[in-house]
Amino acid sequence: MALILTFMAPACASANETSVNWFMKGYTLYYEEKFSDSLDAYNKALELNPKDSEAWNNKGIDQGLLGKYDDALSSFETAVALNDSYAEAWFNMGVIYDIKGDYPTAVQAYKRATEVDPSYHKAFVARNVDTDLLMGRSLSCACQDQLALV
């Protein structure tokens, strides 16, 4: 039994390193603005480690930048299903709902981001902007003061 465990552990570590390597490749390609290639790398990372909430979030970012908004939402939803306290994924979900013009749902996503991380100023500002839009008002003074934080 010990012999089997000895052989299994290195195999698991190797698969994990490969997942991390694909993740880092996706990250690098994203910063080179090669979003399609970055998306491919995140897909490969997720084949090896489908429970990586960061890879799901980053995949969603690439999908959003490529105009695949429904796919992006699905990726962000998977990220928060794996890690409900992932404020950035909640924020990114709100951004996509904003792009789609679904401000009430965007407000809920931003609200969740600020519940998870009260210091997440971008989500706080975006929530206030959308709330003002929904209420048919111009930006409130409090919200205008926060815009510098974005």
Regions found by a protein language model. Name each.
Residues L5-C12:
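C-terminal segment of classical bacterial N-terminal signal peptides
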Residues C12-E33:
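N-terminal leader/linker segments that initiate helical-solenoid repeat arrays
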Residues Y31-K44, L65-T78, K100-R112, L134-C143:
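Structural signature of tandem alpha-helical TPR/SEL1-like repeats
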